[in-house]
């Protein structure tokens, strides 16, 4: 299957169903009263972690994710049905952002759910709107709009250990030697163009190792596999630098690798590192290894030959030891298994802007919510909308901005006269 680790989508939560105006009309029942039911809630767009998924290929080609709308209320006080949610399966390690790169949430566990776009609330029917002062209202509420916006989705592979190095240093050969993974192995650069995962077991302790695409100088600027490669390293708890003794200067290669990590994210240098010198069967490899050990202090260096498999078990035990002594990283943005993200801000915020001498623009979630709930073809519904605006202080704010009787007030796409 083609590996895709980035997708751009637009999510549309369902609108709430409309409440209706109805009255109880039965024989021998005088003054039956209001009987209009409420609308059902719109469906939300919910992403679900699935350990069986390993690519964002489906999301790449499914640009629009739409949840169904709630059902309108019915007479005899019957409420409309809530719409089913739209569940979208994604791989573990999927991260969600808005179009302007604001973090929404991430999926780390199997069956973990993340509500990205919340469905609209169903509107109230006239039965639910009845009060002591108005026992038979002739108006109802329209359903709230569901949230809709563009998102960016990234997959950062979940692995305990990441193998990194320049192209053709032996990463794919190493992961196939220590696990049952079978990546493509060839003698030309960039054979690995997608991450490969392998499970390694040492004395009953198992962990996941990722063979990541080859890194080149200036990868943090987008060269080679660029950021598509570097972002996968962020998940790994331990990094294994694979240096080829075929190189004229393995130490310089090591410095270049760490410089690329630093330029992308300085926090990556805080991760534990193991250095592997591969191709120790080549001439002059021992001399290069001696020079390397003189320059690099305090980090384990394991000489390796994937021809004779020397020191392979030592490397596996070192990986296991490092992992068991490295605490799991906790993402501060993801404290709960269930995360609800909503684009709405403070409901009580009202903004009044003077657009011209006689036109004032009013915005704010509370105003816009009641605007969309109002049926402007129903006079009683419009009167209720005006009462609500006065109650939440809009009239007072307009007067502070200099609004006079006869001026116009713009709310969403509609103009009103200021009286």
UniProtKB/Swiss-Prot annotation:
Coiled coil: none annotated. CDD domains: Obg. Residues 159-324 form the OBG-type G domain. It is found in: Cytoplasm. InterPro entries: G_OBG, GTP-bd, GTP-bd_Obg/CgtA, GTP-bd_prot_GTP1/OBG_C_sf, GTP1-OBG_CS, GTP1_OBG_dom, GTP1_OBG_dom_sf, OBG_GTPase. Its cofactor is Mg(2+). SUPFAM superfamilies: Obg GTP-binding protein C-terminal domain (SSF102741), Obg GTP-binding protein N-terminal domain (SSF82051), P-loop containing nucleoside triphosphate hydrolases (SSF52540). Residues 342-419 form the OCT domain. Mg(2+) binds at residues 172, 192. Residues 1-158 form the Obg domain. The keyword Magnesium applies. GO terms for cellular component: cytoplasm. Its EC number is 3.6.5.-. GTP binds at residues 165-172, 190-194, 211-214, 278-281, 305-307. Keywords: Cytoplasm, GTP-binding, Hydrolase, Magnesium, Metal-binding, Nucleotide-binding. One of its GO terms (molecular function) is GTP binding. GO terms for biological process: ribosome biogenesis. It is an enzyme of class 3 (hydrolase). Signal peptide: none annotated. Monomer. Belongs to the TRAFAC class OBG-HflX-like GTPase superfamily. OBG GTPase family. An essential GTPase which binds GTP, GDP and possibly (p)ppGpp with moderate affinity, with high nucleotide exchange rates and a fairly low GTP hydrolysis rate. Plays a role in control of the cell cycle, stress response, ribosome biogenesis and in those bacteria that undergo differentiation, in morphogenesis control. This is GTPase Obg. It comes from Aster yellows witches'-broom phytoplasma (strain AYWB). The gene is obg.
